[in-house]
């Protein structure tokens, strides 16, 4: 399948070297056009999304299946037919889908639109420009993309809830209790902690070094300092092992489903009024660091967020708790 798609980009034969540039361009375009009839849109989407990370792959495939379900797209059409569509009109139609047709939120519509644009960009490159790139609207009253909320939806625990959650989690699973503390202190994503290797830990300095990949290219190294008491528990847990820090009984890396289950269970046992997910711990870390008076730049050095806007989005402290509450200027 992959080789079939790549055949769209076959090199031109040397027999055309005597022709003019315009003649060669025309021949090449005709060659692409004929080959495009051999590929269905469904085949192309499956091939393309397989090269993306799991989350994006699942999201994009779901988007196109949803677009077909409401009649905005047919995955059975070939690439010739797809190239003749007015992609900008389809983007507009995605944003104007009525609630009577589907219960998409504004955020869902924007995800669907982003998926569609990404597909046209991929095919534009594969077909040497025959498939046009869908252009998002930037008009004030009909923007394709805009921020739907000031802060993220994820809840955050207060200090008492955090202590209660950790207490209950330790009863359920001591290893997952260590995982939760690793995430909290560093404001880390679950994937960053679950993939952690023992070689990244320095027990003498009580630090753990995390690597973040930005756009799959630029590596960002973040060093988090942990309390000595925690490092003692962690060292006892690891013993003489090598490899991943947190492992199952069979020595494999702990999965996301495992901690999602135990975190949720601990939250219930601690009587926390919202579901505790791994991402709640990241929001909790940002909120707690802000409450303790840390600057945005200091928190960014811990969490790895690229901008202060993201820190603001994760900060769940009251918007009334600002400088005007602490001092009067008049």
Curated annotation (Swiss-Prot):
Catalytic center residues: 189, 214, 279, 282, 305, 314
UniProt entry keywords in alphabetical sequence: DNA integration, DNA recombination, DNA-binding, Plasmid, Viral genome integration, Virus entry into host cell
Gene3D superfamilies: Intergrase catalytic core (1.10.443.10)
Residue ranges of every copy of the Tyr recombinase domain listed in the record: 152-327
Coiled-coil portions: none
Biological-process GO terms, alphabetical: DNA integration; DNA recombination; establishment of integrated proviral latency; symbiont entry into host cell; viral genome integration into host DNA
GO MF entry, a single one: DNA binding
Miscellaneous comment: pGP8-D is required for growth within mammalian cells.
Record has DNA-binding as a keyword: yes
UniProt-recorded name of the protein: Virulence plasmid integrase pGP8-D
One protein family per Pfam: Phage_integrase
Lineage: Bacteria, Pseudomonadati, Chlamydiota, Chlamydiia, Chlamydiales
Naturally occurring in which organism (per UniProt): Chlamydia trachomatis serovar L2 (strain ATCC VR-902B / DSM 19102 / 434/Bu)
Family label: Belongs to the 'phage' integrase family.
Domain Core-binding (CB) as annotated: residue spans: 39-124
